[in-house]
Amino acid sequence: MFMDIPAIYSVYRGGKVKAAPVNIEGADISFVSDPMPLEYSADELDDRMPLLVADVRGLGKGGLDDRLLTNMKFPGSDVWFMTCIKDVEDVFDCFMGNIAKVLMPYHSVRNGIVMEEVYEVTENCIPVLFVSKGVVLHRNEGATGIGTALSELERIGFREIIVFDTDSTLRSDDWASLHEKSPDLIPFVRSKGATVDGIGFQKVIFDL
């Protein structure tokens, strides 16, 4: 079954869960306007469909925003929660909240051993490759090729891997090539558009 998965960028501020559009430059994520209280209705999504919630403060400061985790409530949705993950303990901390999947940014994880440990302890964690200017952000502020990063994760055993095109530089033929190599790959695009249409992906994430 094909899934369109909406993504929201959230923060816990002033005693409320709030959200707003963001600007992304490399690994830096910042709100482009003041976050507003989230007006959410379960009717907006199909029953039990995933909803991606990005922890903007956690991604920015390099650690989980536990106030967002404990206060966000999205009845009727399976929450996919993306925050800074450095080690296995961070993954366990995320599962203290009411979430279905932890999304693990490839560039925030300390090393490849942690990736292997995460794969061994849970099947509910999905790596996320942040792509900027056509390359994947890597640890220590470096970069690597998309194919290289995918191969590393697939050798560990991951099949569902999110490729987050943060600056919309990937073209339709890029996505088609990635799908041919990794059919279970999940594109994450900044807006719904033609770049991933008709290629055959089973899930696509897009900014709400």
Regions flagged by a language model, labelled:
Residues 1-77, 86-89, 124-127, 131-161, ...:
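Conserved N-terminal beta1-alpha1 strand-loop-helix module at the mouth
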Residues 4, 92-114, 162-168, 187-208:
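Glycine-rich phosphate-binding active-site loops on the catalytic face of alpha/beta enzymes
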Residues 21-23, 98, 175-178:
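Surface-exposed, active-site-proximal loop segments in enzymatic domains
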Residues 41-46, 71-73, 93-95, 117-118, ...:
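Generic structural signal for hydrophobic
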Residues 65-112:
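Glycine/small-residue-rich loop that forms an oxyanion/phosphate-binding "nest" at active or ligand-binding sites
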Residues 72-82, 121-133, 176-190:
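Short beta-strand/loop segments at the ligand-binding rim of alpha/beta enzyme cores
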Residues 109-153, 193-208:
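Short histidine
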Residues 146-196:
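Hydrophobic secondary-structure block in the mid-to-C-terminal portion of proteins
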